[in-house]
Amino acid sequence: MQSSTDILVIGGGPAGSTAATLLAREGFSVTVLEREVFPREHIGESLLASAVRIFDLLGVRDKVESAGFVRKYGGYFAWREDSWETKWGDPATGGQYGFQVVRSQLDHILLEHSKSNGASVFQPYEVTSLEFDGERPHAALWRERNTGNTGGISFRYLIDASGRAGVMTTKYLKNRRFNESFQNIAFWGYWRGFKLPNIGPSGAILILGIPDGWFWVIPLHNGTISVGIVMNKNAFAAKRRMGASLQEIYHSEIAAFPMVAEILVKAELVTDLQSEQDFSYISEECGGPGYFIAGDAACFLDPLLSTGFHLATYSAVMAAACIASISRNEVDEKEALEAYSIAYRQAYLRYMVLVATLYQNWFGKESLFQEAQRMSLLNVSSGEFISAFNNIISGIEDMQDMGDGRIRFVFSEMNRMTETHFPKASKRARMAQEPLSPTEQAQRKVYAEAVNSCHLFANTPESAVNGLFVRTTPRLGVSRSERTP
């Protein structure tokens, strides 16, 4: 391995590979250190429609399409007494679509694409420590996990895309805040011989609410379906204390939900069950001098709306654009970092409001759609709530633009919203895990209005964050808006 590089990327998942591809194409020397060997298994199979635009930007869409993944034209929700579908398009008439993917396959495609665009990728290399000049990281020590060989590499800029491990956030900054309400356990397996019901759009994900959480059902191109359960950690722990095994909990929940039981009545579970914690968190800052934190390394949200891949890749696009323009002296590093951190956190918080609406303050689907309408800025008229909901959860809303000029007001309101849902450690012990009070519900609506005043990931001069917006042509970077806030 070389002793120095322009850009060091920790992690080769979607955030890391997206940033690596874009920066390598801009002529930077890019080194990716990935602790696993791809292909490797990963959860997060359901992609929003915005993924197609990312694949186009990366120049990898043909490779993704040729893999044969299921095209996802929307989703079907059954939550308490209500049910509805979100439809982005249709195979016969066209329109927007995402994908239902095997992540081991997709992530491998994206990382190999980074290589083909000039990035140097090393696997299985883990970063054991970072070296700093004040607050600025400038070098990393690494270990090759197979041989135990060690070494170091210096860099100009760091992109921490290390996933939930979060090298910067957990080891150095220690600035993660966990959401006390969204602390769940996810467990899942893969089935063959199933029969899907004739509901929802083509290739839809099924999101099915249960008393202590929800099911996902995702059709995959390899002839299997992914059937998973996300369950409140306390409910899960109570079942375990009563002597139920993971397998017993999984199968009993399936048997208790008629739709899922019918889907699997003649099916065979062809894998072992897998599980992991789904504890939502947000970082107080997503960047600092010489570094950007992208994807799950910065923020993780309950997977209810399938936003993980979307947030990871869009944060990577903006981080790459900021680094490109900083390096060309087009923008100041400090203002670019501030714009990046604000834009990414607000993207996260907008989805968090919708998830909170489902989990904590459920008064029927119209309540959910109204929250979406408040946060949508795509000229959705009053009452067209389902359209607003579709715009946001497809990820297309984020593509339109990233902000308007009222950033100072939004930033202060966003901080208040963060304090409500992600208390600092000193407050956690005092926070009961209960639904929001009427006062807190009213506050949340105020915070939603604050989010409503700011678009995400600006791509026009009229919609800039801190006066900056992302451009992808003729070169990737960020430009300054002449518009006065």
What are these regions (language model features)?
Residues 16-17:
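N-terminal Rossmann-fold NAD(P) dinucleotide-binding loop
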